[in-house]
Amino acid sequence: MRRKLVLASNNAGKVRELQTLISTSGFEIVPQGALGIPEAEETGASFVENALIKAYHAARHSGLPAIADDSGLEVDALGGEPGVHSARYAGPAASDDDNIDRLLAALDGVEAGRRGARFRCVMVFVRDAEDTGPLIAEGCWEGWIGENRRGSGGFGYDPVFLVPGTGLSAAELPPEDKNRLSHRGQAAAVLASRLRALTGG
């Protein structure tokens, strides 16, 4: 029987993506919402700090090993914003569309050559709430920000993140291509490999 692992997210898009990406880890993955665990307050100043806050929070509430990620969009012309504030860029209760609207407004008039950006992801695994040696993996996906939304797949900033060499936005990529290329896919591949080593898989 596979060991259970709690996934520290209530974001439906992220849960769906991570369940696919970590499915080879040898663990049975349970979203924290299924266990009645509320979202942790993300008070960290970095992606690593926020990912650890979420993972330890889920482990403490569930008594299970936990995995969490923190990720965001860094836009060169905005000095790296929205960064760790990506999910709340337009305010605490902002929707994906609200955040995209604010981003496009901030980049209004910025020419294509200055719209470089990257998605960054830090993914962590803690064995329990007292784990002093968490596993940490990172991924980075370079691209640039388009002037309009394109595509209906994915979530977050995917409709305005243009993927080099494809002519597509992240929201237009087939899921298997996105999982292979993305920041989250990169981090998950590293972490899944380490988890398989832990479980002997």
Swiss-Prot record:
Give me the residues that bind substrate, please. Answer: 9-14, 71, 155-158, 178, 183-184
The EC number(s) attached to this protein equal 3.6.1.66
Q: List, in alphabetical order, the GO biological process terms annotated in this UniProt record.
A: nucleotide metabolic process; purine nucleoside triphosphate catabolic process
Catalytic activity from the UniProt record: XTP + H2O = XMP + diphosphate + H(+); dITP + H2O = dIMP + diphosphate + H(+); ITP + H2O = IMP + diphosphate + H(+)
- What is this enzyme's class at the first EC digit? hydrolase
Binding, Mg(2+) = 41, 70
Signal sequence, renumbered to the chain:
none
Q: Do you know which SUPFAM superfamilies this protein is assigned to?
A: ITPase-like (SSF52972)
Record flagged with keyword Metal-binding: yes
The residue ranges crossing the membrane are none
Q: Which Pfam families match?
A: Ham1p_like
The GO molecular function terms of this record are: dITP diphosphatase activity; ITP diphosphatase activity; metal ion binding; nucleotide binding; ribonucleoside triphosphate phosphatase activity; XTP diphosphatase activity
* Function field: Pyrophosphatase that catalyzes the hydrolysis of nucleoside triphosphates to their monophosphate derivatives, with a high preference for the non-canonical purine nucleotides XTP (xanthosine triphosphate), dITP (deoxyinosine triphosphate) and ITP. Seems to function as a house-cleaning enzyme that removes non-canonical purine nucleotides from the nucleotide pool, thus preventing their incorporation into DNA/RNA and avoiding chromosomal lesions.
Report the protein name in the record: dITP/XTP pyrophosphatase
In its UniProt entry, the species of origin is given as: Methylococcus capsulatus (strain ATCC 33009 / NCIMB 11132 / Bath)
